[in-house]
Amino acid sequence: MEKSLLFLFAVTLLSVGCTDAGESKGSIHKEKERSKRQALKHLTVTTIMEQPFSMKSESGMEGFCIDLLSELSQSLGFNYTIKEVKDGRYGAKDQDGNWNGMVGEVLRKEVDLAVAPLTITANRERELAFTKPFMQTGISILLRKEDASENSFLFGFLTPFSKETWIGILVAYMVTSLCLFLVGRLSPCEWTELSTEQNNFTFLNSLWFGAGAFTLQGAEPHPKSVSARIIAVIWWIFSIVLVAAYIASFAAFLNSDSVQTTNIQTFEDLVNQRTLEFGTINSSSTFQFFKNSKNPTYRMIYEYMDKRKDELLVKSFAEGVRRVRESNYAFLGESVMQDIMVAKHCELARAPQIIAGRGYGIAASIDSQLIKQLSIAILEQTESGNIEYLRKKWWDNTCSMKRSAGWNPVQPHTLGGIFLILGIGLALGVIAALIELVLKARNNADQQKKSCCSAFSEEMGERLGTNKENQGAVDSVKS
């Protein structure tokens, strides 16, 4: 009996202990969740004034990052206070090894988050925790168009037509001149005096007549026969269409972005030229990239900027853009932000080459519990298309109505119809000349009582000069 009571007492104590342990574990878990919610309840956020990511407005701040932060706060249920970074910098180590800018404020825990176009780099990743990138970017060259076009090629006037089109035009010109010369020889109406065996359309005259059509003025000699006039009319139509297409294409070329694609298209081109100075933001991730790079070209860029640091490096992106617009200066920076300036300022252009692909992320202290939740929320915003919507909202291209974004030289297939009409016209002209010659031969045959074939052969011989050669051979034999 005593053993039974002891057993029941032990079981009771054990069950009570397990219950207390379970309750304590549950309370610990609830306490952690409560602390997370409290951590997300109100956050202090730092940003930097950079169009169109963050900008001051009458109501406070606006921009891509401001809208993104608002979406994240609604998704995760937190409030925030946003302020501008004190020193106006993104964040880099100074000579004493201390971080400045937004990175420094996060490290010193003056703020909870840095929401800005803050590039994710290895050095920053060692000190901070970053979310998944909300935007991808790289390094490129921002130029002024007149600087970009300064060394444009000498034969730019040939650009409205492609090489194949120019070859086709040259072939058409030569074939038309040859057909005009042939018709001038065959058609009886083109011969001034048959006895002198002279006609107006020699080969040189045919070339001159064809070239004159491009001036829309015409040139002598004027065709007299129906066959020559057919070729002349078709060639004039061809020339008018060609000149109109050239003028339209050349105007589109001058008014398009294609005029900016010149010698400075890569970083190698930038290093090899001597016209433009170039630089970037001091202590920025772009500057650090060139500093740490082992690529010979990139090392040359770093050494050039480092030697004249006070002259070439700027304090902000806005200052870099201003120098590009006002002086012979090329600005090295984030391609995404350069595209914004190109869309806003029509006189600017960005080089095609983009290097050092990287992303923009939200930064927090390395022990922060927020990064995981923020990363998931950013991925949700990306998958839902909201990030793309915000980008279109703030990346408004004010130059799209002022210039043609796309331009291509005229290709042969574009003018295929007029080439076909020219070919048909040339064929009709030659056939008409042969008909004229046949009619002349038939008339001579009736008058001279000869067969049509022999009369046609004589006419052909007179046109081509073979009769004179045969007559000369006969005279030499007789002598």
From Swiss-Prot:
GO terms for biological process: modulation of chemical synaptic transmission; synaptic transmission, glutamatergic. Keywords: Cell membrane, Glycoprotein, Ion channel, Ion transport, Ligand-gated ion channel, Membrane, Postsynaptic cell membrane, Receptor, Signal, Synapse, Transmembrane, Transmembrane helix, Transport. Pfam families: Lig_chan (PF00060), Lig_chan-Glu_bd (PF10613). Residues 185-229, 436-479 are cytoplasmic. Residues 1-17 form the signal peptide. The keyword Ion transport applies. One of its GO terms (cellular component) is dendritic spine. It comes from the Eukaryota. SMART domains: Lig_chan-Glu_bd, PBPe. Glycans are attached at N79, N282. Disulfide bonds: none annotated. Residues 18-163, 251-414 are extracellular. It is found in: Cell membrane; Postsynaptic cell membrane. The chain crosses the membrane at residues 164-184, 230-250, 415-435. It is a multi-pass membrane protein. One of its GO terms (molecular function) is AMPA glutamate receptor activity. Homomeric. PANTHER family: IONOTROPIC GLUTAMATE RECEPTOR. Receptor for glutamate. L-glutamate acts as an excitatory neurotransmitter at many synapses in the central nervous system. The postsynaptic actions of Glu are mediated by a variety of receptors that are named according to their selective agonists. This receptor binds domoate > kainate > AMPA > NBQX > glutamate. Belongs to the glutamate-gated ion channel (TC 1.A.10.1) family. This is Glutamate receptor U1. It comes from Xenopus laevis.
